[in-house]
Every structure is written in structure tokens, then in C-alpha cells.
Regions:
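Conserved pre-catalytic core of RNA-dependent polymerases
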Residues: 2-4, 8-13, 17-19, 24-161
Length: 161
């Protein structure tokens, strides 16, 4: 019984240290492997975390919170949300059977203070969901390997840090 209590305490401490990872994707066992290293440094069966309905739902929640414009198909977050359940199921099946194809990004130009324009690519909502699902799986694996002085596009860091 003491061993089970100690394991539970350790799992809770690990969960706190890795609070920024997506809990729908990363189990306590996987977080422990992140901390102690994976035997041989090789991860197996990560694609099932990306393609799972649970992982896609978590990614959808992140995309919803970020909002943003529609992609080349002009579908908005609200439009996708009206049929999110069936759309996520379909996306999961497409990813699993290899028929998923991302759409081209919509190109827009944002004016800069100097009068020039900055190009910006806007992916379709469904493609943003897949990107978020992939990020949720890969980011915790690679985050610890990045240089501590690197701040761009990293969780909990920014250009102003």
C-alpha cells in the first residue's frame, strides 16, 4: 500500500511540473517517461495520440480559444463548431486511414508601420486542429532539448522575456 501511495505522490508532482502539457494526451505514465528518459530514446505509437478523438477534441478546444479567421475555405470557428463532433470524428478517421489532405493556406498581407506589407498564411480550421494535435504530442518531447536562451514559439516564453 505504501508503494502505491508513493507512486501516486510522485505522479502528482510530475503532473505539476508538466502542467503546461495537454492532459488529454499525456498520461502520468508518459510524463514519467519524459522525466526519466525513454529507453533507447525512441518513442513508439505517437500517431495514435494525434489521431485519437480525445486528442483532436483537446486540439479543437485550443483552436477555439485562439479564434482567428477562416482559411482558404472561409470556414469560421463558429461554423466548424456547429458540427464539431461529427467533423472531429471524420478528421480522426481521415488521419487514421491516410486520406487526410491539408488545404492550401489563405495568403493575406498585413500592413507594417513602415508602409510595407507582411505576408501571413491562414490555415483552414481543420488544419489548425491537426497542427495543434501534432504540437500537443511533439512539443513536450522536444521542449527540454531546446536552448534555454531560445524564446520564440515556446510554451511560457515570449520575445519580451
Amino acid at each position: 500500500m505504501e508503494v502505491a501511495v508513493e507512486r501516486s505522490k510522485q505522479a502528482g508532482e510530475i503532473r505539476v511540473r508538466w502542467a503546461w502539457v495537454e492532459p488529454m494526451v499525456w498520461t502520468d505514465r508518459m510524463l514519467a517517461a519524459l522525466e526519466t528518459g525513454v529507453q533507447g530514446g525512441v518513442w513508439f505509437s505517437l500517431i495514435d495520440k494525434v489521431t485519437s478523438l480525445r486528442g483532436l477534441r483537446a486540439a479543437w478546444g485550443q483552436v477555439q480559444r485562439n479564434q482567428g479567421s477562416g482559411g482558404v475555405d472561409r470556414e469560421t470557428i463558429d461554423q466548424f463548431g456547429r458540427e464539431a463532433g461529427s467533423r472531429l470524428s471524420k478528421l480522426s478517421e481521415q488521419l487514421k486511414n491516410g486520406t487526410y489532405q491539408p488545404l492550401p493556406v489563405r495568403r493575406v498581407y498585413i500592413p507594417k508601420p513602415d508602409g510595407k506589407k507582411r505576408p501571413l498564411g491562414i490555415p483552414a480550421v481543420r488544419d489548425r486542429i491537426v497542427q495543434a494535435a501534432v504540437r500537443n504530442v511533439l512539443e513536450p518531447i522536444f521542449e527540454w532539448e531546446f536552448c534555454e536562451h531560445s524564446y520564440g514559439f515556446r510554451p511560457g516564453r515570449g520575445a519580451k522575456d
